[in-house]
């Protein structure tokens, strides 16, 4: 049986700004002594690393590896020989949380080298895209055509609408070449824009409406399943994967109040919204692509879910 882990992050602390997590966690864990104390406390109270503290300690420990290859080797060690991995870079340079030591272009370049270092295409790289970067369309297409990247990775909570017009050429290209677009879909997003919303962020690109929302509500709107409907309407064959399937909190909400008992859509769990999209005549699940030839349409993994949608 072939195994494909469809959601792997290999970035290190060099790719993250000082305030990418709530203050003062990122600043404190940059101090080696603090990390050692955290590891000691985590082992003391949670030997199996099953609690939130244990998981965070493991994440911090791993992120302080020097290279993405070191991080990847840790992940790979948990899987049998022949397992393939979808690598999803994260672009945190525009989230107004401080500068990063290594930008997204260099992060992509390291993934290119990482992919070349392993046989049998066990590394399946996606390209992180952010419409605020100049040349994002040309650079992304070059990664796909020259370096064999297999899809697009979005993370709208860092400060942009998923339907931003600057991304339309990439969506058209992805639709034409049957490439998947994987986007973050859970709330609250732990990695998110830290500044005051800009006029650009507060303008809905579909309706032109000026949104009267605070930062948290705005960023939540960016990754709401409903935010992808204009995209699917404009690009009816675009393959969109809503990573985490709404998130663990919305799965809990769904179990408390299933989709059929909801009365107001704004109050629906995101799981319910996604299930409605899958059940509707307008949408259908879609099969594998050349990027992930044996990946099932719905992939389940610990603490998160993923599904693909296309519009008929």
What are the functions of these language-model segments?
Residues 1-176:
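Mid-domain alpha/beta scaffold segments of enzyme catalytic cores
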Residues 150-151, 161-312:
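Catalytic pocket-lining loop regions of alpha/beta-barrel enzymes
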């Amino acid at each position: 049986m072939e195994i494909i882990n469809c959601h792997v992050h290999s970035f290190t602390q060099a790719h993250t700004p000082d305030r990418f997590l709530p203050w003062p966690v990122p600043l404190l864990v940059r101090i080696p002594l603090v990390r050692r104390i955290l590891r000691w406390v985590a082992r003391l109270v949670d030997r199996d690393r099953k609690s939130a503290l244990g998981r965070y300690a493991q994440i911090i420990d791993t992120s302080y590896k020097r290279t993405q290859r070191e991080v990847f080797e840790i992940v790979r060690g948990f899987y049998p020989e022949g397992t393939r991995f979808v690598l999803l870079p994260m672009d945190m340079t525009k989230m107004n949380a401080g500068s990063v030591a290594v930008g997204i272009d260099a992060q992509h370049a390291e993934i290119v080298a990482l992919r070349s270092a392993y046989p049998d295409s066990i590394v399946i790289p996606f390209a992180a895209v952010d419409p605020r970067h100049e040349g994002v369309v040309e650079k992304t297409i070059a990664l796909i055509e020259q370096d064999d990247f297999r899809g697009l990775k979005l993370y709208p909570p860092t400060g942009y609408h998923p339907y931003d017009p600057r991304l339309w050429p990439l969506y058209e290209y992805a639709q034409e070449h049957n490439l998947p677009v994987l986007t973050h879909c859970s709330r609250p997003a732990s990695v998110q824009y830290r500044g005051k919303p800009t006029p650009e962020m507060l303008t809905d690109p579909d309706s032109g409406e000026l949104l009267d929302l605070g930062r948290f509500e705005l960023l939540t709107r960016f990754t709401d399943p409903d935010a992808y409907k204009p995209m699917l309407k404009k690009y009816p064959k675009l393959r969109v994967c809503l990573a985490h399937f709404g998130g663990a909190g919305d799965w809990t909400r769904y179990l408390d109040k299933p989709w059929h008992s909801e009365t107001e859509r704004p109050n629906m769990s995101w799981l319910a919204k996604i299930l409605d999209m899958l059940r509707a005549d307008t949408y259908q699940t879609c099969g594998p692509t050349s990027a992930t030839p044996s990946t099932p349409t719905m992939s389940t993994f610990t603490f998160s879910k993923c599904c693909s949608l296309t519009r008929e």
